[in-house]
Amino acid sequence: MTKGKSSPSSGKAPPLKSHGPKRTLQKKVVVVSKEVLRSQLERVNALASNWLTRLGRHKASKKQRVIHSASDCSGHGSDLIAYRLLGLQSQVQPVMMSEVSRQKVLLHQAVAQECGWNYDDHQVIDMFLRKEESMKTADVYVAGYPCPSYSKLGKRQGVSDQRGLLTLKGLEYVALCRPKVVVLEQVKAILEKKHSQIWNYILKILNKLDYVFDHQVLSTQDFAIPQSRPRVYILAVAKEICAGTVKLPEKRSEKVDLHHFIQKDKTGSEVLQLPRYEELLGSKMWRKGYILDVGSSEKFQAAMTNCAPCLTHTRLGQGGYYIPKLRRRLLLEEAGALQGVPKKVVRAMQRAAEEHKLPARTVDASLGDAMSINVLASVLMKGLTHSRLVQFSAQEDHWRLVANGPDAATLSDRLFDGTAWAGPGLK
């Protein structure tokens, strides 16, 4: 018998196949030359040094009728969904977005229309190709840069990788236009010593641009959605219009249980035996993100604490998340809910994918790339309040106040429909 394989009579189950390569983020690395990197660093630094003579300071206003928004590495439009859930679709006007993936641009179009915006008003542009004169000034700038350049699943070349250089291209826009509010997101690995140079550079540029800012690691599970997805967020507000010290939103003290987000009435025919997973992956299998709802096993119930692992582009794109108790894969709407995306938006993305004949699981993969809507909306709420562009009350901090129960799982849907709140309490 060949070593490593078990025969049907051996009593051992054959090993389960891993769904996709383990280190797919290492593909397609384009190394940036030292000259290009030095030139980009110098350009951003120069723009940050002379912003006051070029732009002048923002003027504080009691109420701004239209808020112009721009985003880079826009994906399917997480910022638009967040604005809609905050009830700002009539106040926010998107003016610029960047995205090189044709598939995501098509999904972004569907999301914009579903959220109530005319997609024709968007300026869609490649960050590497846009010219200074083509950049539209915005009040709010949101960017979640590609993670492979910093993630432990990638080669971690930082800004020496072309995808990592997008961080500097985004900072170029910030230095050139100096939006009133800036929201930046990246995997927490950027805080490690290996990437300390670029991290300190980002903070230095924000200081030069006279921003008041805060940075912190926030996870999706900190805001009423049970997914372990730690990300570094930077919230910066122009000093002259900032009301006090900038603080990122407070984390919830109470976690929400995963089972509220799983549709238990839907089961599948894929019989997945948990002991076989235990044998294959070992006692820390839950960290690898292959299964959810591990409450069906006492061993993993305590380890996972009723929380989904980080939903990634690769595994969502390959259907790699299983719910053993229900004998099926994670549904697309469930993945959307665990990212804070309303069902109506997920369905709009599905329709667009079918209409344009996009590859299977395009929507799944896009969800895995995106910022979690609950976290982004909470951060935007703080930024808009600190900048006095919009005033939110404490009772509108939906994700911090919602109870651990079915209401948490449907909160995004109800906010999208405008039915979540009646005065200070949940309907």
Q: Where do the protein language model's features map onto the residues?
A:
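Alpha-helical recognition domains of nuclear gene-regulatory proteins
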Residues: A82, Y173, I205, V379-G383
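Eukaryotic short linear interaction motifs
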Residues: S78, V105, A243, Q318-G320
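Intrinsically disordered, low-complexity glycine/charged-rich regulatory or linker segments
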Residues: T2-Q64, F392-K427
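C-terminal target-recognition/interaction regions appended to catalytic cores
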Residues: W51, R276-K427
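Core alpha/beta nucleotide-donor-binding catalytic domains of modification enzymes
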Residues: S33-V181, K188-E192, S196-N200
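Short amphipathic alpha-helical interaction elements and helix-loop-helix interfaces
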Residues: Q89, E114, K208, K344, ...
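Class I S-adenosyl-L-methionine
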Residues: R130-V140, P148-G317, K325-R328
